A protein has these predicted regions:
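Short, charged, low-complexity patches
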Residues: 98, 231-236, 240-243
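Extracytoplasmic/secreted cell-surface and envelope-processing proteins
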Residues: 25-27, 230-233
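Ligand-site clamp/hinge motif
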Residues: 225-228
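Beta-lactam-recognizing serine transpeptidase/beta-lactamase-like catalytic domain environment
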Residues: 1-222
Length: 261
């Protein structure tokens, strides 16, 4: 179910992204099946290292029936496919994986291995030698498919019903983004899910992914705030400040309004 009281009614792809409609993706995951779902998410780099030049990177977990059988010696259930559709359950992803996937959406469908080092030199008086660009791979999506997702992400930020509406207010550039909120516990009856009323370790994880300018992307950002509450009210405003710092002169940066939770 959705956290929106009364539901969202009938929605299309664009509205499902803009308004963060969980039930749309429950249905989509069931229609796809976990095998196809797993294969598509792997194209974006989930369940594997990003290739960044750092030691200790973990691949995360892209759950599947095979993975669960090896890990727990248990069968896969349809309900686990359903919650995989919104990135919950056994999923484990890193901020770097989210950044790589977001950049793939923004750049036209190429997954590029991440790196920190751009050039090296052997001494202070030696010339810098650029590091060779790592080869990119196609995620296998058509231009039309990518544009559908990009349109939905832009609607999330620049339409009144979009979960990121308040984050983008006053921005001189267009943002494409998606808020996310990961619950640590299940909703039970009338128990309040307001993170402010929960112990710290049970509060939601707040996420935001995005890129800008939407029509000609120059930067992709990811913000994850552990136990931070909601993506729209906690992670999103941080991302806006990052985008402003990168894209605007300091005098033009605008502090986003805090939305109502």
């Amino acid at each position: 179910r959705d956290s929106h009281a009364g539901g969202h009614g009938t929605v299309d792809l664009y509205a499902s992204i803009a308004e963060s409609v969980n039930t749309y993706y429950y249905r989509l995951a069931m229609d796809m099946g976990i095998a196809k779902f797993d294969a598509y998410m792997r194209r974006y780099g989930f369940g594997q290292p990003t290739g960044i030049d750092l030691i200790g990177e973990i691949p995360g977990i892209l759950p599947s029936p095979e993975w669960k059988r090896k890990r727990f010696n248990q069968p896969w259930y349809l309900g686990e496919t359903v919650i995989a559709g919104i990135g919950q359950g056994y999923w484990v992803v890193t901020p770097l994986q989210l950044a790589q996937g977001t950049a793939s959406l923004a750049n036209g469908g190429r997954r590029i291995p991440l790196r920190l080092v751009q050039a090296t030199r052997t001494g202070l008086n030696q010339a810098w030698q650029p590091m060779p660009a790592p080869p990119s791979t196609s995620i296998g999506a058509t231009a039309a498919q990518l544009q559908d997702i990009r349109t939905g992400m832009e609607a999330a930020m620049h339409t009144r019903k979009g979960t990121g509406w308040a984050i983008a207010l006053g921005s001189p550039y267009r943002i494409a983004g998606k808020t996310g909120t990961v619950q640590k516990i299940s909703r039970r009856g009338s128990v309040s899910m307001d993170p402010r009323s929960l112990p710290l370790h049970l509060r939601h994880q707040a996420l935001f992914i995005g890129y800008a300018p939407a029509e000609n992307p120059k930067i992709a950002v990811v913000v994850v705030v552990e136990h931070g509450g909601y993506g729209a009210s906690t992670a999103g405003p941080i991302a806006r400040k990052m985008l402003d710092a990168y894209l605007l002169p300091k005098s033009e940066a605008v502090v986003p309004e805090k939305p109502n939770d």
